[in-house]
Amino acid sequence: MKLSVDWLNEFTPLSQIPFEKVLEKINTSICEIDDVEEFKSHLSSVITVKIKSLEKHPNAEKLQTTIATDGSKEYQIVTAATNVAVGDIVPLALPGTKLDGKEILDSELRGVRSQGMYCSEKELGMALESSGVLILPKDTTLGISVRKYFLWEDTILTIDNKSITHRPDLWNHFGFARELASQLQIPLHHFPLQADTKWESGNQGLTVEKSEHAHAYYVCSIQNVNITESIPKIKSRLEKCGIRSINNVVDVSNYLLLELGQPTHFFDRSKLQSTSFTVSKSKEGESISLLDDTSPTLPNHILLIQNGETPVALAGVMGGKDSAVSESTKEIVMESAVFKREDVRYTIRKTNIRTESAVRYEKGLDSYTCLPVMKRAVQLLKENGNPNVKVFEPQGFNHTESKTVTIETNLSFLRHKLGKKISLHEVTDILQRLGFEVTTKDESLSVLVPKYRQNYDVTIPEDLVEEIGRTIGYASIRTEALSMAVETPIRNPLRELERRVKQFLALEVGFNEVYNYSFASPTDAKLEKEFEVTSLKIANEMPEEHSLLRNSLYPGLIKQTKVNQDRFEKVNLFELGRTYHKEGNDATLAQEKRWISLLSLSKCKPTDLSSIEDEFLTVRETISELFLFLNLPKFEWVKLPRTHFHPNASLVLLYDGKEVVELGILHTRFADLYDLKRRAILSKIDMEVLVQIWETYGRNSHFVPPSHFPQGQLDLSLIMNESDPTESFANLVKTLRIPELESVFVQTIFQGESVGEGKKSVTYRFILMSYDKTFTQDRFKELSDRLVETAKSNGYSLR
């Protein structure tokens, strides 16, 4: 947002305060300033001169030689302009001036000295194109800067919008001046909302139907309108704030927006089809032609202004083209309204149209200004080329006219929250300067919030603390050490466990942690079929891809993988996060579950099933190592199908009979849905179940000294059906309770012609360890024979 210091001075005497102090107070007590600049400072050396003589250039047919005077000094200027004549007053850029990035020089043009350059509107930044030198009125004072002539001598403050998004009262010059006056303790001496305007009796047939879709809505009829240019003051102020002048009626609407922050709109009455107005909502497929020459097709529930049955404006956003003010306009209808900020935000989001009016409405305006702004508009219309307008009584409604906000608090609360001892007199003085009405009894305060601050801004005692704190300056609050006792924090087992799991995944096995939004699309919600019915829709209107709270961490990991699959051969990701589920029809809160989910993207082609199975087993081994890292060795892998996994690659890890982990290869239909080019291996760990198991079995580590004897290993290759789970034989061996057996795992899996169609060769590796003696060849043979016998007796054949 841009603010004119000259305009602010109209309301409060900022010129009496050192400018550096004003800037400091804004930054420390009100908002951040992005930039401070002198408006069109590069034109300071462009002055007004009068052409005294004009002759043909002796050496160039298309050039002319002129003598111009600023009243005290003469300049010889060579020009190619054909629209200048003796006696014309024109702008002259003196040597050293920079226009369009080029410096004007005292130079010779075809042998004749030229001491500057006459300027067009384009070169002064007043128009995109111009056909010749700008000719100024005959009564223009000579020798003055064009900055002074066009009222451009001003300093412009660019305010960071984010820092005042909660302060709609500051989105205008009067509101900002009012705030500055209170902070700098200087008076306000101009009150535009107190304009003295008399209405003509009657309403000229206009009617407004009451509507629940607006806080307030008024219209009035204005006759004897003359369309012309705006006066210099209004044109220059609009330009300094980045708004192009249109005409003396439309400019008043824009001027009011910048002066008071209250949007208004003017309709050409001759173009209206009816005398009745109402605020309603659109129907699917309805269309309206807007001032920006677009005709959007509207969805349901867009807020509209209806004239009879015809939509004439997107309420709070933009007016319609068919009822716009034009050069032939003689009678207008003025609109002043306050719409619900939720409705305006919905319109912005659905139409992607954001205007200065919409920005202010979406912050939440109070309706008390609607009628005073109409009076101020009439005053400006009369000043701006329409002294004879007749304005008839406004028609409309105001649903929130009597709204008040009173906050009860006490001095001890304010002192405690501020961290500073402050007197009751000081508190009262600060709040009253800021426009609050304060009633005190002993140390209790009853504070009536001013109307321009009561909408979504100051509503609770903590807001008063902020008002006092920023006014006295946060730097004045002394820094003190914490006065509370330093105690050992309460142990949080879940946080401890999460830290250990993240340490293992990130540091031990090289997975990368990611963070994803907690929002999901309807498509994402269908990935884990068991959770689809528990999906929660976000109450606030959101784009479809973010319309639900996530019920699974998998979609976020898959989307991250999709982005990175062409950049990296190896993609191993994990995320620690919450999912949200509907607990029941009567539940008021969502059920939150905490998970760690993993994704490992295969490095192989989707058709290389043997290599993919090896990678799947590697991930399974990684999770097994995690449980050993957590001192939880007594786990069991069991085949259990999941709809989102491949039917032959879906496992769960059980511990003490409880399901803790699921692991599988993402089903091809989901891989295709998310455009994954390679197979993805997914897993998730239920952290709530895991922490219970870890607290019960894993926290107390027991040191087992290493054996003094070397370990041995046996490999056994078996032929089995392609669909047989590899863990079946491993689990069978564990039931033999061989005392020397430390672990068993799958070393390799092979498929090919040599093992037969529909078959696979699986090589198991058995790690053997004795703690009291060295293995002998006889014991190795005995164990090997026992394993072979077990395999054969259970239907497996040796390879």
Curated annotation (Swiss-Prot):
Enzyme class label: ligase
Entry-linked Gene3D superfamilies: 3.30.56.10, Bira Bifunctional Protein, Domain 2, Ferrodoxin-fold anticodon-binding domain, Nucleic acid-binding proteins, Phenylalanyl-trna Synthetase, Chain B, domain 3
Pfam families assigned to the protein according to its UniProt record, in alphabetical order: B3_4, B5, FDX-ACB, tRNA_bind, tRNA_synthFbeta
Stretches of the chain forming a coiled coil according to its record: none
Keyword terms, alphabetized: Aminoacyl-tRNA synthetase, ATP-binding, Cytoplasm, Ligase, Magnesium, Metal-binding, Nucleotide-binding, Protein biosynthesis, RNA-binding, tRNA-binding
Record-annotated FDX-ACB domain positions: 707-799
GO biological process: phenylalanyl-tRNA aminoacylation
Binding of Mg(2+), residues: D457, D463, E466, E467
CDD domains in alphabetical order: tRNA_bind_bactPheRS
Cofactor: Mg(2+)
Cofactor descriptive note: Binds 2 magnesium ions per tetramer.
Domain tRNA-binding: 40-147
Catalytic activity: tRNA(Phe) + L-phenylalanine + ATP = L-phenylalanyl-tRNA(Phe) + AMP + diphosphate + H(+)
Cellular component aspect of the GO annotation: phenylalanine-tRNA ligase complex
Subcellular location per the Swiss-Prot or TrEMBL entry: Cytoplasm
Enzyme Commission number(s) of this protein: 6.1.1.20
PROSITE patterns per UniProt: B5, FDX_ACB, TRBD
Keyword ATP-binding: yes
Molecular function terms from GO: ATP binding; magnesium ion binding; phenylalanine-tRNA ligase activity; tRNA binding
Protein name per UniProt: Phenylalanine--tRNA ligase beta subunit
Organism: Leptospira biflexa serovar Patoc (strain Patoc 1 / ATCC 23582 / Paris)
